[in-house]
Amino acid sequence: MSNMSTVRRPWIRALAGAAALALVLGADEPTKTVDAGGLSFKAPESWKAVPTSSPMRRAQLKVEPVPGDEYPALLVVYAFPGGAGSVEANLTRWQGQFKDADGKPPKIESKTVKGKNTEVTRVETAGHYKPGAIPGMAPEPERQNARMLVAIVPTDKVGYFLKMVGPDKTMTALKPSFDALISSLEVKEE
C-alpha cells in the first residue's frame, strides 16, 4: 500500500498542477461577447476593454501579464473597409516587425482554422518586436521576447485583423484562450 501511494503522489501533484495552470490560462473563466462592428467574438472576462485610439480600431482588450512579465498583452481589432492587402503581404509585414536572436526575421506560422461562421487565418511569431509606425498614432515601444498572435478574417466588405502582442510567457499562456476566441468569431452584416 505504501508503494502504491508513493506511485500515486506524482500523479496527484501533476493533476493539481494542471488544474492550477488551467485557472491561470482562463480555461474555466466566464466569457463575455465583444462586438466589433461587423464582427463579434467571446473573450475571457478578465480581458479588460480599453479605449481605442483610432476609428480603424474597433476594439482593444488588455490582458494582465503572468508573474515575471513586465507589461500586459494587448489585443487590437482592426477593420479595414475593402481589406488591407493579401494574407501573404500582411505576413511579410508582420514578420518584418520581429527579429530573432541573430537579428533575422523569425519563423512565422500560419494556418487556416474555423471561426463560428467564417474561415480564419491564424498567425504566430515571436522575437524582438519593433512595430511599424502608423501615421497619426503614437508609436508602440520596442519589446524584447515578445510574441504575436493574429486572426485574419476577410469578408466581402471589410478585412478584420485581430492582433495580440505581449511578453512571450504571457502570450504563450494565452494561446488556448486566443484559439477559443477564434472559434467564436462570428461575421455579421455591417
Regions of interest found by a model, annotated:
Residues 2-16:
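Bacterial N-terminal signal peptides that target proteins for export
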Residues 17, 23-31:
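Bacterial Sec-dependent signal peptides at the C-terminal "C-region" and cleavage site
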Residues 31, 49, 110-112:
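Beta-strand-rich interaction surfaces with strong enrichment in secreted/lumenal proteins
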Residues 33, 37, 42-103:
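Secretory pathway targeting signatures of secreted, lumenal, and periplasmic proteins
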Residues 37, 66, 80-82, 126-130, ...:
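Solvent-exposed coil/turn segments that connect beta secondary-structure elements
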Residues 45, 55-58, 91-153:
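Signature of long, low-cysteine stretches enriched in small and polar/charged residues
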Residues 47, 156-190:
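Surface-exposed amphipathic alpha-helical segments
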Residues 54, 68-70, 83-87, 142-145, ...:
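Solvent-exposed, acidic/flexible segments
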